[in-house]
Swiss-Prot record:
This is Eotaxin. GO terms for cellular component: extracellular space. The lineage of its organism: Eukaryota, Metazoa, Chordata, Craniata, Vertebrata. InterPro entries: Chemokine_b/g/d (IPR039809), Chemokine_CC_CS (IPR000827), Chemokine_IL8-like_dom (IPR001811), Interleukin_8-like_sf (IPR036048). The keyword Glycoprotein applies. PANTHER family: EOTAXIN, SMALL INDUCIBLE CYTOKINE A.
């Protein structure tokens, strides 16, 4: 009985000091893009986008979500990417409070 209690205590201590336990509830998983597409995505296939500007990622990127729920990383400096973001912004404006 004493061995199982000690083992349980060690497991709890290990879980408390694991990297996930130390990050706290405010941490959010970071999505990074490691390769960027060079191909222009047709506007009718795009559903939404989000910008990746985290300092934890190797490069800034835009992730487009297609209507088929596929995520595609693109270079935010490219003109077609900027035009696509403007198109999506006009298509679904943010609701006013």
């Amino acid at each position: 009985m004493k061995v199982s209690t000690t083992l349980l205590w060690l497991l709890l201590v290990a879980a408390a000091f694991s990297p996930q336990g130390l990050t706290g509830p405010d941490s959010v998983a970071t999505t990074c893009c490691f390769t960027l597409t060079n191909k222009k995505i047709p506007l009718q296939r795009l559903e939404s986008y989000r910008r990746i500007i985290s300092g934890k990622c190797p490069q800034k990127a835009v992730i487009f979500k297609t209507k088929l729920a596929k995520d595609i990383c693109a270079d935010p400096k490219k003109k077609w990417v900027q035009d696509s973001m403007k198109y999506l912004d006009r298509k679904s404006p943010t609701p006013k409070p």
